[in-house]
Amino acid sequence: MMARPVDPQRSPDPTFRSSTRHSGKLEPMEATAHLLRKQCPSRLNSPAWEASGLHWSSLDSPVGSMQALRPSAQHSWSPEPSVVPDQAWEDTALHQKKLCPLSLTSLPREAAVNFSYRSQTLLQEAQVLQGSPELLPRSPKPSGLQRLAPEEATALPLRRLCHLSLMEKDLGTTAHPRGFPELSHKSTAAASSRQSRPRVRSASLPPRTRLPSGSQAPSAAHPKRLSDLLLTSRAAAPGWRSPDPRSRLAAPPLGSTTLPSTWTAPQSRLTARPSRSPEPQIRESEQRDPQLRRKQQRWKEPLMPRREEKYPLRGTDPLPPGQPQRIPLPGQPLQPQPILTPGQPQKIPTPGQHQPILTPGHSQPIPTPGQPLPPQPIPTPGRPLTPQPIPTPGRPLTPQPIQMPGRPLRLPPPLRLLRPGQPMSPQLRQTQGLPLPQPLLPPGQPKSAGRPLQPLPPGPDARSISDPPAPRSRLPIRLLRGLLARLPGGASPRAAAAAACTTMKGWPAATMTPAETSPTMGPPDASAGFSIGEIAAAESPSATYSATFSCKPSGAASVDLRVPSPKPRALSRSRRYPWRRSADRCAKKPWRSGPRSAQRRNAVSSSTNNSRTKRWATCVRTACCF
């Protein structure tokens, strides 16, 4: 029949209902146990009664007892089902300590009297509730015996409170005579009366000016002892502290119904679960954070690879710069595959380097190590030069290093030995030399040992193949800039052609150039296969000259022209660019969303505005991304 112990801060009612239920049936001893569990009621039975030999709640108009009860209820009292009575009293005393000075000094007389009213009513009602005959109210008779000085009448209940707790502390026991089961029973009743808080005040009960039929002796004797106690109490105060302060440290959370042992138990910081309280969590921030950080990482990282992946999907398969090229189709003989032997680190001869394009039949003159590197990348016959990264006019011919960012262009001696006919030897070269990324060819294009010219996928693909993936972002812009600078001068034939077409077409040069060069877009996608001249030609039939000039697929053109058209660069860029931009946008999204969510949280301000803006932003972002 344990009533749940009540938490200090919580108003006692709910629990007490249960106690009310039981208290009628309690055996004397049980009653005592019960009292031990709830400090309040037991606080009633205190040495004061031993003095009077009678039970406060019944004798002295219940005020005293009620007084004792109520404040204790209001101030938290420790609910621990104190198996050790000592401890329990300790706690009570602790709270009392807070109460005493206050109530003694500040509580006005009226308040005390008021209490007396209320408490009397309560007691009476409780006794009726209990219905046990012994408890029927001893009607307080105005006994002339009892004329305490009014101030004493006021002060007494309050003082009694303090002193009771003191007494209990000193005695070290529950301070009610174990011998009087009846008393303990009644005190229980009193407690329950307080718990079932009837709002009714019976007018019948007189204010406490007189004590109910009890001898005056107890109260007369009482004040002396009380005052002593009060005096000592101030000195003793430090002693009241509960024996192990740790138990006091965690106050139970406000609404909690758990047993104190739960909230008092030492807690590892990890066990504490996040609370809804505004205070910062007990749990360490590191514990929450790493996941967040990791998540964001996951967000950001894939985006980088995805960038390159998407672009290969365009039908070319440039490998990330450092990576050795993947082996072409399984069906292809592997040996031919390393057509670019390690020696040709610049895998794809840039068109600008004049490399003799070997027809399939030719044995490829493999550059001797002494050969300067730029010429060195001898285009394998199978590969039209177009795919090779065409050095844009501004660029030195060393694009190959760009191609293989990690690898210095160094010519392994074995390289020169390789002949197109010797399939095995190329393979060996490859193994002997650095593992070169093999020329980036679309996987579909087998590099046959003979290296017959393999029809490459359409020019744009080839071009993008040879594009070094790495520096892509800044390079094209630089190149375009260089190209534009060249345009007026017509330094390179290709540039001249471009200038010619732009002027011939009647497009203002300005419009054309921005279109080609807009860093974001690159040349319009329509132009994918063609050099500037070709674009122009396609767009206006009148531009025949430019068309004739540059209409051959730019690959061929670049072969002849010393300066390869920059366009392919730009072009691959253009096709690359729209999605690349969107990827950037997406990549930024998580970062933006971090602060954004914070704003969302913080801006309790104009909700409409915020939401509208937010919604708009979201729409835009989504639309642009995809």
From Swiss-Prot:
Domain of life: Eukaryota
Listed Basic and acidic residues bias regions: 281-312
Annotated region described as Disordered, given as residue ranges: 1-29, 173-223, 236-473, 556-612
Biased composition (Basic residues): 570-579
Stated consequence of mutating residue 201 to H: In a colorectal cancer sample; somatic mutation
Primary site of residence: membrane
Compositionally biased tracts (Low complexity): 337-346, 416-435
Membrane topology: Peripheral membrane protein
Any one annotated GO CC term: ruffle
Biased composition (Pro residues): 366-399, 436-445
Keywords: Cell membrane, Cell projection, Cushing syndrome, Disease variant, Membrane
GO biological process: adenylate cyclase-activating G protein-coupled receptor signaling pathway; bone development; cognition; developmental growth; hair follicle placode formation; platelet aggregation; positive regulation of cold-induced thermogenesis; regulation of signal transduction
Comp. bias regions, Polar residues: 186-195, 255-270, 600-611
UniProt-annotated location(s): Cell membrane; Cell projection, Ruffle
Primary role: May inhibit the adenylyl cyclase-stimulating activity of guanine nucleotide-binding protein G(s) subunit alpha which is produced from the same locus in a different open reading frame.
Further remarks about this protein from its record: This protein is produced by a bicistronic gene which also produces guanine nucleotide-binding protein G(s) subunit alpha from an overlapping reading frame.
Assembly, per entry: Interacts with the N-terminal region of the XLas isoforms of guanine nucleotide-binding protein G(s) subunit alpha.
Family statement: Belongs to the ALEX family.
Disease: GNAS hyperfunction: This condition is characterized by increased trauma-related bleeding tendency, prolonged bleeding time, brachydactyly and intellectual disability. Both the XLas isoforms and the ALEX protein are mutated which strongly reduces the interaction between them and this may allow unimpeded activation of the XLas isoforms.
Full protein name: Protein ALEX
Species of the source: Homo sapiens
